[in-house]
């Protein structure tokens, strides 16, 4: 392993170790909200723009994941239809409401809003939309980054029922390179995926203990066809991406 790859591993490991203790109470609160939604036959929606949308894809139809999860996916807020355009789109007031209208978010649901900076128009609008509909809001964001750049703007963390601080630094990248003023090695994705999968694992354990396993099995595992088919049939009505 080279010196810089070693530094990256060490940084991520150190941040995860710190998060495990510092976020324990907030992660438990997030699991409480999601478990309550599952018991009430509600859904957990996941929203993010740009690279943050990967959290929605990570939790959707995932081996070991929860079938109540619904990703909010639209080309205009993702990267594959134009990264520069998506960066512009997420800053336009009112742009994401028509996207959210397609999903039927309602009272008792949970919306996980992922935004590293936590100040762009899209995640703010998504959180406010969820509040209008009576859904609980879990924010996954970098508190340090958001506080640094807010400059009087509304912050996602101020709108959420639960805030999961991913501990990513301002600008996301953590590694300095000799001879350059720029940094490499963003950490928000690695940290965010770990936080959310840990929360969802907690929820799954609770539901299994209550006799209702809502867990997808990897498609290559024996018996996965029948298990996953039943879950898809049960939850397809409110998940357009199944």
UniProtKB/Swiss-Prot annotation:
Stored InterPro entries: RpiR-like_SIS, SIS_dom, SIS_dom_sf, SIS_GmhA/DiaA_subfam, UPF0309
SIS domain boundaries: 30-209
One example of a Gene Ontology biological process annotation: carbohydrate derivative metabolic process
GO molecular function (one): carbohydrate derivative binding
Pfam families per UniProt: SIS_2
UniProt cross-references to PANTHER family, sorted A to Z: PHOSPHOHEPTOSE ISOMERASE, SEDOHEPTULOSE 7-PHOSPHATE ISOMERASE / DNAA INITIATOR-ASSOCIATING FACTOR FOR REPLICATION INITIATION
Similarity remark: Belongs to the UPF0309 family.
Protein name per UniProt: UPF0309 protein BOV_A0853
């Amino acid at each position: 392993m080279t010196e810089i790859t070693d530094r990256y591993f060490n940084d991520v490991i150190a941040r995860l170790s710190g998060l495990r203790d510092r976020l324990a109470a907030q992660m438990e609160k997030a699991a409480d909200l999601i478990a309550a939604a599952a018991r009430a036959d509600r859904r957990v929606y996941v929203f993010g723009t740009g690279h943050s949308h990967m959290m929605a894809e990570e939790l959707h139809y995932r081996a070991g994941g929860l079938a109540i999860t619904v990703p909010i996916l639209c080309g205009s807020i993702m990267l594959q239809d134009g990264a520069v355009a998506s960066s512009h789109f997420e800053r336009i007031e009112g742009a994401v409401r028509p996207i959210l209208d397609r999903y039927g978010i309602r009272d008792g649901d949970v919306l996980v809003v992922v935004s590293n900076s936590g100040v762009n128009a899209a995640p703010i609008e998504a959180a406010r939309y969820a509040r209008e509909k009576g859904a609980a809001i879990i924010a996954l964001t970098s508190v340090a980054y958001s506080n640094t750049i807010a400059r009087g703007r509304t912050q996602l963390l101020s709108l959420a029922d639960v805030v999961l601080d991913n501990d990513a630094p301002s600008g996301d990248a953590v590694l300095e390179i000799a001879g350059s003023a720029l940094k490499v090695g963003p950490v928000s994705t690695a940290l965010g995926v770990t936080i959310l999968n840990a929360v969802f694992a907690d929820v799954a354990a609770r539901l299994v203990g209550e006799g209702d396993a809502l867990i997808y099995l990897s498609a290559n595992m024996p018996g996965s066809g029948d298990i996953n088919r039943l879950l898809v049939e049960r939850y397809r009505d409110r998940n357009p991406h199944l």
